From Swiss-Prot:
Family: Belongs to the peptidase S1 family.
Lineage: Eukaryota, Metazoa, Chordata, Craniata, Vertebrata
Localization per Swiss-Prot or TrEMBL: Secreted
Cleaved signal peptide residues: 1-23
Name the UniProt record assigns to this protein: Serine protease 53
Source organism (scientific name): Homo sapiens (Human)
EC number(s) stated in the UniProt entry for this protein: 3.4.21.-
Main location, first listed in the record: secreted
Disulfide-bonded cysteines: 62-78, 158-230, 187-209, 220-249, 326-342, 444-464, 474-502
Tissue expression as described in the entry: Predominantly detected in testis, liver, heart and ovary, as well as in several tumor cell lines.
Purpose: In vitro can degrade the fibrinogen alpha chain of as well as pro-urokinase-type plasminogen activator.
GO biological process, one term: proteolysis
Length: 553
């Protein structure tokens, strides 16, 4: 009968393991003494028993959170310098209200081991988390961790805790800060509205963001690695994120970037013994905050169809003395880009009006700015910027189109879309979308130089298109935008200059290529919406999520 003992022992072991796991889950995430609800400002002793000060040679470097009796979770970038990996110089302080020294009842523990994700390269690239194994167990209550499928309430209030070195109010004292969780797309949208390329799309796969209350300074130096935690309905506090980095101490218009703990839960589960990964109620609804920021190049309706009416919320219809004359693209709250040749001999702003998106009304023009080097379409520089008489309010029916930076790729063979008229000379009701294939200057030059072509030189600042298929009737529209999609974001690739955009490959249409004119546009109106090309999605922690990693990754 000995063969029976194996299964019996396994079942008993599993029972003990399950009981231990359930006990850990009950114990984790229980806030200590203090007000019934967290209050903005200084904490009280023991309020957050898992709060850790990560120190090197006694000086506070980063914050962290106790997630098991021998494990502290913090940020990888705290250990980027070579000297930082000398573990005997590092320690973790638990239970202290002060950034320096030890509060009564605080405990300082040495660090026995450090674990970083293999994919970590730089905090801006993601995977910014680290595990510190303590030299001996501690009795402080740990924070709960989320399962991989955990959904946090975007737009709802969670809390960050840290010492916030830049505050003048009780410097060096542990503080509570209310943060609203912000999804990655919305966070990127907010940062892109700062119109600074080095801050473009900072939230990468495996990140989320947190925004402080209006007028309140967010996490700052020394708060890196600290927890952002949310209260679950069952009363447990769960770590939603790890403070990674911010611009200007996370002001309202520049949220703090967080490592998404749930996105790295599998990595944590494989390494942390004794941590409680809290199961979430399956009834938790999906939550979205997409409506809180209007992103350039975002299309909330069905995509374009050949020959169908335009779905573009950035479409501009230029009316000269009441007649449809040209197309264009809305690129900010008050700017439209179009072709310069539309205005030769008719440059009085009062003669023009602009229809936008799906809105029925029209806007007047305050100013017309033609590129100073423009002489004729075949000579290039066929671009103009129009300033509206009044700024528009962006929303579902009006959104700006993203402008590309000079290194934006417009590869041969890429699918694009243009606007055309269903009938020659027809008005607004005849506008339709036309699918096209992008052609670079070399391929386009060969076709224009071939028999039957017009022999026009194709300059480096141009891009060409060839219509895909045939529509029953179609005529290109001067100044109309050439748009293409990159992983869900739409960009202005070009503005129609000459040639018929409805023609096939024998006579490609020619467009002013927007990547070549970033300097000119920026010099006129820095408020336009430039955007980086979205990078390929990847599993958080994978090498693909960190494109600057060496190939050995």
């Amino acid at each position: 009968m000995k063969w029976c003992w194996g299964p019996v022992l396994l079942i008993a072991g599993a029972t003990v393991l399950m009981e231990g796991l359930q006990a850990a889950q009950r114990a984790c995430g229980q806030r200590g003494p203090g007000p019934p609800k967290p209050q903005e400002g200084n904490t009280v002793p023991g309020e957050w028993p898992w709060q850790a000060s990560v120190r090197r040679q006694g000086a506070h470097i980063c914050s962290g959170s106790l997630v098991a009796d021998t494990w502290v979770l913090t940020a990888a970038h705290c250990f980027e310098k070579a000297a930082a990996t000398e573990l005997n110089s590092w320690s973790v302080v638990l239970g202290s209200l002060q950034r320096e020294g030890l509060s009564p009842g605080a405990e300082e523990v040495g660090v026995a081991a450090l674990q970083l994700p293999r994919a970590y390269n730089h905090y801006s690239q993601g995977s910014d988390l680290a595990l510190l194994q303590l030299a001996h167990p501690t009795t402080h209550t740990p924070l709960c961790l989320p399962q991989p499928a955990h959904r946090f309430p975007f737009g709802a209030s969670c809390w960050a805790t840290g010492w916030d070195q830049d505050t003048s109010d009780a410097p060096g004292t542990l503080r509570n800060l209310r943060l609203r969780l912000i999804s990655r797309p919305t966070c990127n949208c907010i940062y892109n509205q700062l119109h600074q390329r080095h801050l473009s799309n900072p939230a990468r796969p495996g990140m989320l963001c947190g925004g402080p209350q209006p007028g309140v300074q967010g996490p700052c130096q020394g708060d890196s690695g600290g927890p952002v935690l949310c209260l679950e309905p069952d009363g447990h506090w769960v770590q939603a994120g790890i403070i990674s980095f911010a611009s200007s101490c996370a002001q309202e218009d520049a949220p703090v970037l967080l490592t998404n703990t749930a996105a790295h839960s599998s990595w944590l589960q494989a390494r942390v013994q004794g941590a409680a990964f809290l199961a979430q109620s399956p009834e938790t609804p999906e939550m979205s905050d997409e409506d809180s920021c209007v992103a350039c190049g975002s299309l909330r309706t069905a995509g374009p169809q050949a020959g169908a009416p335009s779905p573009w919320p950035w479409e501009a219809r230029l009316m000269h003395q009441g007649q449809l004359a040209c197309g264009g693209a809305l690129v900010s709250e008050e700017a439209v880009l179009t072709a310069a040749h539309c205005f030769i001999g008719r440059q009085a702003p009062e003669e023009w009006s602009v229809g936008l998106g799906t809105r029925p009304e029209e806007w007047g023009l305050k100013q017309l700015i033609l590129h100073g080097a423009y002489t004729h379409p075949e000579g290039g520089y066929d671009m103009a910027l129009l300033l509206l008489a009044q700024p528009v309010t962006l929303g579902a029916s009006l959104r700006p189109l993203c402008l590309p930076y000079p290194d934006h790729h417009l590869p041969d063979g890429e699918r694009g879309w243009v606007l055309g008229r269903a009938r020659p000379g027809a008005g607004i009701s005849s506008l339709q979308t036309v699918p096209v294939t992008l052609l670079g200057p070399r391929a386009c030059s060969r076709l224009h130089a071939a028999p039957g072509g017009d022999g026009s030189p194709i300059l480096p600042g141009m891009v060409c298109t060839s219509a895909v298929g045939e529509l029953p009737s179609c005529e290109g529209l001067s100044g109309a935008p050439l748009v293409h999609e990159v992983r869900g974001t739409w960009f202005l690739a070009g503005l129609h200059s000459f040639g018929d955009a409805c023609q096939g490959p024998a006579r490609p249409a020619v467009f002013t290529a927007l990547p070549a004119y970033e300097d000119w546009v920026s010099s006129l109106d820095w408020q336009v919406y430039f955007a980086e090309e979205p990078e390929p999605e990847a599993e958080p922690g994978s090498c693909l999520a960190n494109i600057s990693q060496p190939t050995s990754c």
